[in-house]
Amino acid sequence: MKLLSRLLGRRRPNAGGQAAAMRPYFYLGEEIALTRLKCGHFIYVDPLEESVCSHLIAHGEWEASTRRVVLGLVNAGDHVLEVGGHVGYYTLGLAQKVGSKGSVTTFEANPRLAALSRRSIRMNGYNDRVEIRQQAVTDVAGDIRFSVSRQFAGGGHLYVWDGALGADTEVIEVEGIRIDDLDLPDVKLIRIDAEGSEPLILRGAEKMLQRHDIILCIEWDLVQMSSRVQMDTFISWLADRDFLFWKITGSSELAPLTVADLATLPPCDLVVARKQPVLGLGQTR
């Protein structure tokens, strides 16, 4: 435990000859390591995972502009639903932002990632407000096949074909659930990063989406989503529910989009709501 009780304080010269602080990183074995995020949270990571964990280890952050918007969408006491929590990077920030009177319910189908996330939540003292559920969210309840990879764990998804994530792809069976079948408090924000399953997840949340003030933050990837649904039908489905759309920019701003824009939009993160959200960016870190 002595290793975990201190941070690395040594400095080394970088390529330009200037001193650069070493990233705090604690290797705990082949399966697990611990690092500290720029925001101050400690987070458990898989040292062999390259899609997200490598960035957290090297830089202490990931998708900084999107994270800033996500945290800016919630306030103390809010309730958040997260689908695709990975190792808990967004989860930790959301837990801090909603405070002890709020809650975060996070779904992560990959058992390895869910276990790491639970450890991080416990270490940072958020067990009172966060629940990590190792289940897949979709539009039909029941056991489903789910593709996982240790090297590229950020790409885990509802099964499409064998080997989709490379040589170490493994297909596991997990419990699938619908959001509308859950007994949850009044959710303000749904954050979804599900590698193309976003349309299925939202169709299983139709009752929750009837809340006038609901806000969605979703990954938008036409290629991935079109493997699940007809995109013109899905876009019309969203528009028919009076949703408006904004793209999250690299400077953490919300750029308005038309419904027509969605059909040709390159991969990005969207905020979806029925009125322009107010971002509390000054309160995030």
What are these regions (language model features)?
Residues 1-129, 168, 245-285:
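S-adenosyl-L-methionine
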Residues 32, 178-285:
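Conserved acidic-Pro-Pro-aromatic motif
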Residues 49, 85-87, 111, 137-139, ...:
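Short, glycine/acidic-enriched loop or turn micro-motifs at the edges of active sites
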Residues 111-114, 118-153:
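Core alpha/beta nucleotide-donor-binding catalytic domains of modification enzymes
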Residues 152-156, 278-281:
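Short, charged/polar, Gly/Pro-enriched secondary-structure boundary elements
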